[in-house]
From Swiss-Prot:
It is an enzyme of class 3 (hydrolase). It catalyses: ATP + H2O = ADP + phosphate + H(+). A motif ([ST]-Q motif 1) lies at residues 1089-1090. Residues 39-70, 1009-1058, 1073-1096, 1110-1129 are annotated as: Disordered. Changing R714A: Impairs ATPase activity and ATP binding. Belongs to the DNA2/NAM7 helicase family. Residues 52-69 have a biased composition (Gly residues). This is Regulator of nonsense transcripts 1. The [ST]-Q motif constitutes a recognition sequence for kinases from the PI3/PI4-kinase family. Residues 1041-1058 have a biased composition (Polar residues). GO terms for molecular function: ATP binding; ATP hydrolysis activity; chromatin binding; double-stranded DNA helicase activity; helicase activity; protein-containing complex binding; RNA binding; RNA helicase activity. Changing S1107A: Impairs phosphorylation. CDD domains: 1B_UPF1-like, DEXXQc_UPF1, SF1_C_Upf1, ZBD_UPF1-like.
Length: 1129
């Protein structure tokens, strides 16, 4: 696949993993394909006796295609009464006999293959029913074959993975008879864990599970060689000696089913286990939600699109969590310092392997501190009991124990420990708050300023400068001095109603955010609201803001009040305890702590006093910090916040961001990095419709240019070179030198002493993890352990090393492998953090080891494909990075090909034993230059529902290619201050001009500070808008005629030769769909048409007026076609 697949102008074919994005083939049986000369395909099922059925006379029945042809020829010769028109009876009979004799086609059996009743053991997907080829799923009670058909793995493996089943039985008439596959040693039946070892003495194989049986030496027979252990499922198929793979001919004869149909069928089976493929065609099945848009007509349309997506995610989350009930739980009881009962328990070990349930609870259900769990006693030794508590401890590398603090310990059977059951208590609070915010945005005029309202909906609005007194010194007290790009960011943000700050890894965005909050608070416009999607991010920012000396209140959810954090002393509930101004409240609090309960009168008085104290603290605070969803807390409901800052906004969904925004935002600052991982959306349907794209991303695509922080202080300069060039256009400067990043007392032999990095070539094979939904690679795990041991021996401390991998299966396997197989003390390995790449976002370690896992022939590299995941992985380390992977599999993907070529050029692609590494001789295809776009990182926005093609039309105001002078508009619109030179001239040359109304204007001279530019910064009316939600008009107040009907409109220009075609994009009520020869559908607006009768002067006025619209190109749209290539490293 060419690298240009990442470029917006790419016309190359991009082949996707079917597991990542299933492709649906053309519907060749649709009505437009009804040709009378064609016969129906063999897989079409029709009722017996019907057309093509047994005894039927149709095209698919006995005789098949030939029957149709014979009938046609006979009709030409036989009249309506059946009498031969030429009277030559004998000749006609002879010809007819000859025609009938020619009808013995081999397809006879094939055509009736699916019209007859299939045996009960036929594959539920494709109908193949050879007993040697099929396997019975013990959970779903269905049969599946071991053939791939049109999918990336065999049908049985596809089903097991999608349905989360793990136990199978072979067919009684198959070569191995009716066999339940299970571990010879422990009886484990999870086929994803099972493998075989050939017994040396006998001609038999022994089935053993991967962990622990195949790896425990004490359990081994003298004839077993555990190094020979291989999984039963390889390349997503059962081994052919175990379950035969149907022949190619059999698979072609079978019913053809696509991966997308399989997905839909599996979803349907959850509701109706007896559903068939035919049921998928019924109306109402699998209705897709409406996709998110780039622009919205008004907030009602916005709510009508996002509301259903939030509900979809809520329903999915509820279903998932409420289905996870666990029995046979053993509880260990304890008493907390606050006199509340704490129950400790571990999830039971199952046949699926000991990490399976932990994976589901941590990854799928995202179990975290503060979640509610219901604990029930089901035994006979005490009365039946039920209690609800909040999670205060989750499983980690040290153990799988979960701890919950009970709300009330009344009746708790603390004397018994067995026969408990746990249920996850699903709470709709966060989803309710999102829905409420969407509604408020639509109906409440005071929820946000007019300017922000229109900007968020994508309307064109005159830019404004906020009237404020800029500080003489931008660095905040108690915080480090700012660099030039941070100063520019602070200075610009303070004067803008809406700002985006892009903070690449290690560029100090937390310090910048804290400084901005400090100056906003000093302006005295009431408390500043600071939010982030996660509690960890909120705590980090709260800590930094506190260092400036401001009065900060950290608002926690009530369910998290018992959880300790570095900023607990700033939490609202703890500050209330220390309020000297309310002695009565302190007295009642002390009584409650000692006795655990208060009388009803005292409790009522206590709550009233507490509410008063909370209100007083919140009103007098300079800054209030909480999560995005926490901003919907009733305690903030009556407060209005003029200034709101959302950190890590690229990790929040759009409705999540709206929860704080609707609390009166007049100045909104979004901080994040759209070149790193985006929000997590569990429901695939909602994610596909666009819920997985952040507000920050959409605003970037709309043309609001983020201010980028440009000096990184984390990585050794050698480590930052590749991410800077590939993800940030070479704009990152190093705030640390190579000498700053050499560890004292650390003696590790890097292949190149001045470059603390290498790619360790590993030839292992991937295996499906025990959960069936993840992967692991045992060879890579062994190499990771060796590298970790070498780092420890060289002088690194365990807590300075981070091991990251994209796959939960590998993370879990690594934790176990390090414990059982590490050559050093177990405690050392326990202190080494092992986590998924996604969980490590926002974190850093001195040394990072990345295990890539994927190594196969057919499956691709899964979500290693997401370049943002690679960006996060490569930018976590301060002193050194080691990548362990299979270059052959990875190099097929363009970005990884770049990385591998880069490592090879730097002579750090190595193989061989660790104590004698040598340069690898592997060769890769030469990478092409990645296309440089207007929107840095836009080519990596895999979650984007639309791309930034609007912003990269060659010859437009955006273009600065080397094929000619920039357009004259460039000099009028480019802000020279906006992009601070990154040093090397070739990098500076890649600065891309921005449309005038979206750029941060040059700072006005001191005498003009504080003056508004254009409409007041409050509720402005957008260009062409009659007011909030009003119908859009053109610049001259006239409704614009439909553009495609005008002879001189953009749609009528013949630009078919240009390589920028894009599907139709509907934006609000404006239909953007345009003819196929139009190379930029969606880029022109019907309201902004150029009428043919307009004189040149009038047209030029329109051109100037509309040149400030981010989508308008005028007659400059296609001056030339090139796009600047990205400068290499």
């Amino acid at each position: 696949m060419s690298v240009e697949a990442y470029g917006p102008s790419s016309q190359t074919l991009t082949f996707l993993d079917t597991e990542e994005a299933e492709l649906l083939g053309a519907d060749t049986q649709g009505s437009e394909f009804e040709f009378t000369d064609f016969t129906l395909p063999s897989q079409t099922q029709t009722p017996p006796g019907g057309p093509g059925g047994p005894g039927g006379g149709g095209a698919g029945g006995p005789g098949g295609a030939g029957a149709g042809a014979a009938a046609g020829q006979l009709d030409a010769q036989v009249g309506p009464e059946g009498i031969l028109q030429n009277g030559a009876v004998d000749d006609s009979v002879a010809k007819t006999s000859q025609l009938l004799a020619e009808l013995n086609f081999e397809e006879d059996e094939e055509d009736t293959y699916y019209t007859k009743d299939l045996p009960i053991h036929a594959c539920s997907y494709c109908g193949i029913h050879d007993p040697a080829c099929v396997v019975y799923c013990n959970t779903s009670k269905k049969w599946f074959c071991n053939g791939r058909g049109n999918t990336s793995g065999s049908h049985i493996v596809n089903h097991l993975v999608r349905a989360k089943c793990k136990e199978v039985t072979l067919h009684k008439d198959g070569p191995l008879g009716e066999t339940v596959l299970e571990c010879y040693n422990c009886g484990c039946r999870n086929v994803f864990l099972l493998g075989f070892i050939p017994a040396k003495a006998d001609s038999v194989v022994v089935l053993l599970c991967r962990q622990p049986c195949a790896s425990q030496s004490s359990l081994k027979d003298i004839n077993w060689d555990s190094s020979q252990w291989q999984p039963l499922i390889q390349d997503r198929c059962f081994l052919s000696w175990l379950v035969k793979i149907p022949s190619e001919q059999e698979q072609l004869r079978a019913r053809q089913i696509t991966a997308q149909q399989i997905n839909k069928l599996e979803e349907l089976w959850k509701e109706n286990p007896s559903a068939t493929l035919e049921d998928l065609e019924k109306p109402g099945v699998d209705e897709e939600p409406q996709h998110v848009l780039l622009r919205y007509e008004d907030a009602y349309q916005y709510q009508n699109i996002f509301g259903p997506l939030v509900k979809l995610e809520a329903d999915y989350d509820k279903k998932l969590k409420e289905s996870q009930t666990q029995d046979n739980i053993t509880v260990r009881w304890d008493l907390g310092l606050n006199k509340k009962r704490i129950a400790y328990f571990t999830l039971p070990k199952t046949d699926s392997g000991n990490e399976d349930l932990v994976i589901i609870w941590l990854r799928d259900m995202r179990l975290m501190q503060g979640d509610e769990i219901c604990l029930r006693y089901k035994g006979d030794l005490a009365p039946l009991w039920k209690g609800i508590g909040h999670v205060i401890k989750v499983p980690d590398n040290y153990g799988d124990e979960i701890a919950i603090e009970l709300r009330s310990s009344v009746g708790a059977p603390v004397e018994v420990t067995h026969n408990f059951q746990v249920d996850f208590v699903w709470k709709s609070t966060s989803f309710d708050r999102m829905q409420s915010a969407l509604k408020t945005f639509a109906v409440d005029e005071t929820s946000v300023s007019g300017y922000i309202y229109h900007k968020l909906l994508g309307h064109e609005v005159e830019d404004v400068i906020i009237k404020c007194q800029l500080p003489k010194r931008f660095t905040a007290q108690g915080l480090p001095d700012l660099n030039h790009s941070q100063v520019y960011a602070v200075k610009t943000v303070l004067q803008r109603p809406l700002s985006l700050i892009q903070g690449p890894p290690g560029t100090g965005k937390t310090v910048t955010s804290a400084t901005i909050v400090y100056h906003l608070a000093r302006q005295g416009n009431g408390p500043v609201l600071v939010c982030a999607p996660s509690n960890i991010a909120v705590d980090q920012l709260t800590e930094k803001i506190h260092q400036t000396g401001l009065k900060v209140v950290r608002l926690c959810a009530k369910s998290r009040e018992a959880i300790d954090s570095p900023v607990s002393f700033l939490a609202l509930h703890n500050q209330i305890r220390n309020m000297d101004s309310m002695p009565e409240l302190q007295k009642l609090q002390q009584l409650k702590d000692e006795t655990g309960e208060l009388s009803s009168a005292d409790e009522k008085r206590y709550r009233a006093l507490k509410r008063t104290a909370e209100r007083e603290l919140l009103m007098n605070a300079d800054v209030i910090c909480c999560t995005c969803v926490g901003a919907g807390d009733p305690r903030l409901a009556k407060m209005q916040f003029r200034s709101i800052l959302i950190d890590e906004s690229t990790q929040a969904t759009e409705p999540e961001c709206m929860v704080p925004v609707v609390l009166g935002a007049k100045q909104l600052i979004l901080v994040g990095d759209h070149c790193q991982l985006g929000p997590v959306v569990m429901c695939k349907k909602a994610a596909k419709a666009g819920l997985s794209q952040s507000l920050f991303e959409r605003l970037v695509v709309l043309g609001i240019r983020p201010i980028r922080l440009q000096v990184q202080y984390r990585m050794h300069p050698a480590l930052s070179a590749f991410p800077s060039n590939i993800f940030y256009e070479g704009s990152l400067q190093n705030g640390v030198t190579a000498a700053d990043r050499v560890k004292k007392g650390f003696d590790f032999q890097w292949p190149q002493p001045d470059k603390p990095m290498f790619f360790y070539v590993t030839q292992g094979q991937e295996e499906i993890a025990s959960s069936g939904t993840s992967y692991l690679n045992r060879t890579e795990a062994a190499n990771v352990e060796k590298i970790t041991t070498k780092l420890l021996k060289a002088g690194a401390k365990p807590d300075q090393i981070g091991i990251i991998t994209p796959y939960e299966g590998q993370r879990s396997y690594l934790v176990q492998y390090m414990q059982f197989s590490g050559s050093l003390h177990t405690k050392l390995y326990q202190e080494v953090e092992i986590a998924s790449v996604d969980a490590f976002q926002g974190r850093e370690k001195d040394f990072i080891i990345l295990s890539c896992v994927r190594a196969n022939e057919h499956q691709g590299i899964g979500f290693l494909n997401d370049p943002r995941r690679l960006n996060v992985a490569l930018t976590r380390a301060r002193y050194g990075v080691i990548i362990v992977g299979n270059p052959k599999a990875l190099s097929k993907q363009p970005l990884w090909n770049h990385l591998l070529n880069y490592y090879k050029e730097q002579k750090v692609l190595v193989e061989g034993p660790l104590n004698n590494l040598r340069e690898s001789l592997m060769q890769f295809s030469k990478p092409r230059k990645l296309v440089n776009t207007i929107n840095p990182g836009a080519r990596f926005m895999t979650t984007a529902m639309y791309d930034a093609r609007e912003a990269i039309i060659p010859g437009s105001v955006y273009d600065r290619s080397s094929q000619g002078r920039p357009s004259s508009m460039y000099f009028q619109t480019h802000d020279q201050i906006g992009m601070i030179s990154a040093g090397p001239s070739h990098v500076a040359a890649m600065n891309i001009p921005i449309p005038f109304n979206l750029v941060m204007p040059p700072m006005p001279p001191p005498g003009y500070f504080g003056q508004a530019n254009g409409p007041a910064a409050g509720r402005g009316t957008p260009k062409g808008k009659t007011g909030r939600g009003g119908r859009q008009k053109n610049r001259f107040g006239l409704p614009g005629p439909s553009q495609t009907n005008l002879p001189n409109s953009q749609a009528s220009q013949d630009v078919a030769s240009q390589p920028f075609s894009q599907g139709a994009l509907t934006q609000g009520y404006i239909s953007m769909s345009q003819p196929s020869q139009m190379s930029q559908p969606g880029l022109s607006q019907p309201e902004l048409s150029q009428d043919s009768y307009l004189g040149d002067e009038f047209k030029s006025q329109i051109d100037v007026a509309l040149s400030q619209d981010s989508t308008y190109q005028g007659e400059r749209a296609y001056q030339h076609g090139g796009v600047t290539g990205l400068s290499q490293y």
